[in-house]
């Protein structure tokens, strides 16, 4: 069951006072947060549909809030000291176990004898880190397969830095990590001791080498540890399983699905794209008396011939099994969608957390293949009441039948205030971004000119500064004003976009970000054309 449709998950009402929307403001309602992209732009927690990249901590008890502050003073310092000492202990055990060994030695054969025992001691030290960090209870369900039965552990959902507790509690198994990880102070030695499979990002053959290493370990007669892979590739809020990256499934070997659950009263450790930062999460997690983690091993999944030949099919089928066991839907969202949302946020696009759903709805309406947004953009400043459009006017402007359900969905996605109205500017910014997200910033800025100025040849200072806010966060107000004055050498009070382009071309080393194309983002189906005047 795949979901990408509007689905209420918390009602349309703003939560009552006392609900924590931002971890820094305990006891303060913060369902809606003002962004600085436009006056009429808001970002909400995405309760129109299941958005796996949004998380809010809801603590509605004044007693609980008081407890957090009391334990911050009485318990948190002790826990921090305990975590640090445990980490140092684990590092010391790892250093002893690695004495006289190189990375090549670790890659050549599995650890045996006393080095294997020291590896267990290192894992115990890391387990104490989590114990001091409030995770006193880790429940194991199901039977953990051996490395010969399932060389790969596919873990989901991936929602937090705490998920690494699985590595500590399960052996430890190996992980797939960037080569640079080995150089991290303290943790680098500990990770090395788990005999990870390192990925060389600068090597174009890195993926094939990683697959070969996994297959070699699986077929070896030596006692290699299993390899843990978080198949989602990014953190989610556990409301749905997003698309699995196929890396764990390319080798075509049996895998064991592993579920991570956190049956606690408050979710203070989910770390998503739109949510509390890691330090705030650590603070709230370590000021609980204790937290629970549940690790469930599902039966080994042996791929069919079709699945061995098609890693994506294999990944999707394993995901369905895990979603059914968790009782959650699967989602069309993927790691690449996080890249799109991050780019939208950097470019001050309204509702960046919803931009993927907005794009899908625009495509269903066929607006991605039309030039209606460019036409509306060109005449935008001559329109009235564009910040308060009802559904009828909105449909007429888009030239879409009012009976079209996707029009109503798009309207709901843009109506974060639940006022029954939407902003035309917000829609145009979203629509143009969806079409031009693979283009360079200069092309995108050119498409937005008429949202701020009647003519591309006479852009006043205020309009120029507002336009530059969409330059990926590289040109703040102070820099944009300085750039305007550098262009307006004759003190006319306005500049042309062409003069701006000319200056950036002459100083391309300073403005190379304007010419960079994000080829890794999904390509749009159509390209928008814009008029200059």
Swiss-Prot record:
Keyword line: Acyltransferase, Calcium, Endoplasmic reticulum, Golgi apparatus, Lipid biosynthesis, Lipid droplet, Lipid metabolism, Membrane, Phospholipid biosynthesis, Phospholipid metabolism, Repeat, Signal-anchor, Transferase, Transmembrane, Transmembrane helix
Domain EF-hand: 402-437, 439-474, 475-510
Recorded GO CC terms: endoplasmic reticulum; endoplasmic reticulum membrane; Golgi apparatus; Golgi membrane; lipid droplet
HXXXXD motif, short sequence motif: residues: 158-163
Transmembrane segments: 80-100
CDD domains according to UniProt: LPLAT_LPCAT1-like
BP term (GO), one: phospholipid biosynthetic process
Impact when changing residue 175 to M: In RNA edited version
Localization: Endoplasmic reticulum membrane; Golgi apparatus membrane; Lipid droplet
Membrane topology note: Single-pass type II membrane protein
Mutant lacking the gene: phenotype: RNAi-mediated knockdown in larvae increases lipid droplet size and reduces lipid droplet number in fat bodies.
Family statement: Belongs to the 1-acyl-sn-glycerol-3-phosphate acyltransferase family.
Primary role: Acetyltransferase which mediates the conversion of 1-acyl-sn-glycero-3-phosphocholine (LPC) into phosphatidylcholine (PC). Has a calcium-independent activity. Displays a clear preference for saturated fatty acyl-CoAs, and 1-myristoyl or 1-palmitoyl LPC as acyl donors and acceptors, respectively. Involved in the regulation of lipid droplet number and size.
Domain notes: The HXXXXD motif is essential for acyltransferase activity and may constitute the binding site for the phosphate moiety of the glycerol-3-phosphocholine.
Protein known as: Lysophosphatidylcholine acyltransferase
Organism: Drosophila melanogaster
Native organism taxonomy: Eukaryota, Metazoa, Ecdysozoa, Arthropoda, Hexapoda
